[in-house]
């Protein structure tokens, strides 16, 4: 799920095509789930779309707020990493206990029954209310959403799957939108290309305040 240049939701068939072509041509399929990992489900986008990548990368959420990154792959691929294999990978802060402890605590929370269902329901209710209001005013406005990730797009387009489909002029509208929300006590990322997230820490009061401000 490309989510660092807008939220570009891909079709299931396209992702399956990538998997098939990589397999047929002996190419590794890598899923970057630094943003989508653990946000759209405990198995990330790979689980959501039922696609098995050869290599997968994670970050952000797995550290519970602490800086951390991780990657995983099949046993055959991971056998290439030292000391078993020739590829050296290490770092001063690799596996540092503070980040690992925070990450374990975070993942324990995510595994609680109903966690993702409640989070997605909260996000969907928030997004739907804003979208319905925009449509009632005939605004050129669309909120793209998957799981707890959403993206405000000032466009009438129903689908945006590639970065070059984003109207760059709409970013001028976002600048005003961002400034007005700041004045009302709601902070979004400073770029119109950035996605936003709902977390379990957001209360109903938080969501209502943001909704009314928007």
Regions found by a protein language model. Name each.
Residues 1-214:
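Conserved N-terminal phosphate-binding loop of PLP-dependent enzymes in the Aspartate aminotransferase
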């Amino acid at each position: 799920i490309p989510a660092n240049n807008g939220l570009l939701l891909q079709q299931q068939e396209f992702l399956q095509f990538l998997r098939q072509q990589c397999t047929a041509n002996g190419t590794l399929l890598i899923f970057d789930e630094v943003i989508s990992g653990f946000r759209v489900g405990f198995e990330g986008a790979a689980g959501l779309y039922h696609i098995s990548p050869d290599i997968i990368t994670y970050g952000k959420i797995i550290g519970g707020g602490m800086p951390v990154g991780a990657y995983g792959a099949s046993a055959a691929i991971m056998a290439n990493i030292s000391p078993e294999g020739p590829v050296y990978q290490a770092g001063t802060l690799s596996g540092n206990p503070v980040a690992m402890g925070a990450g374990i605590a975070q993942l324990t929370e995510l595994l609680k029954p109903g966690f993702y269902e409640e989070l997605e329901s909260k996000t969907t209710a928030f997004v739907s209310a804003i979208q319905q209001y925009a449509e009632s005013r005939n605004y050129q406005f669309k909120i793209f959403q998957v799981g707890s990730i959403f993206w405000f797009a000032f466009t009438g387009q129903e689908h945006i799957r590639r970065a070059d489909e984003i109207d760059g002029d709409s970013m001028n509208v976002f600048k005003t939108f961002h400034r007005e929300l700041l004045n009302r006590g709601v902070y979004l990322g400073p770029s119109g290309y950035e996605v936003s997230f709902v977390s379990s820490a957001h209360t109903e009061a938080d969501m209502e305040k943001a909704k009314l401000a928007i």
